[in-house]
Design a protein with these regions (language model features):
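Conserved Nudix-box catalytic region and its N-terminal flanking loop in Nudix hydrolases
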Residues: 26-66
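Acidic, metal-coordinating catalytic segment for phosphate/diphosphate chemistry
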Residues: 1-22
């Protein structure tokens, strides 16, 4: 059981503050997205920091858990937080996220859904994106405005 799941048992649906890592996998100018099972919207692979873990470790772990992929290196792109990273899950859980956005480099492995958090994994061009979860939309807008070099 994750640390956040344990906290949820104590605080119920009240807002929690969570640090986590989100991982950009970009291949041939396309971004890897996951169709989330909890919201049925597309997001960027990632998740919450566990006790004793550094954010880079979170990025490596979440990439493997959610996509089946490995990366040789994670490069920190930016840290994002604030009102745009407040999220209410369909079950009513409220969360303020502090997101460390990483770029996965030298990615290997075979795409596969391994954890039940994703319904589908797919690469999309930045100019033809599906229905995005709000935090993913904010991160992609940030990339388009501040790090066009990542898009290709």
């Amino acid at each position: 059981m994750s640390y956040l799941s344990e906290l949820r048992k104590i605080v119920g649906h009240r807002p929690l503050l969570s640090a986590g890592a989100t991982v950009l996998v970009i291949k041939d100018g396309k971004i890897l997205l996951n169709l989330r099972s909890d919201t049925e919207t597309w997001g960027i692979p990632g998740g919450g920091l566990e006790l004793g873990e550094c954010l880079e470790e979170t990025a490596f772990r979440e990439l493997k858990e959610e996509t089946g992929l490995n990366a040789e290196k994670m490069t920190l792109v930016t840290v994002l937080s604030g009102k745009d990273f407040y999220f209410v899950y369909p079950n009513g859980d409220m969360l303020y996220s502090v997101v460390s956005l990483y770029l996965a480099e030298n990615v290997s492995g075979e795409l596969k859904i391994t954890d039940g958090e994703s319904l589908k994994l797919q690469y999309f061009s930045f100019d033809n994106l599906p229905n995005l979860e709000s935090r993913a939309k904010t991160m992609i807008e940030w990339i388009k405005e501040n790090r066009k070099d990542l898009i290709g």
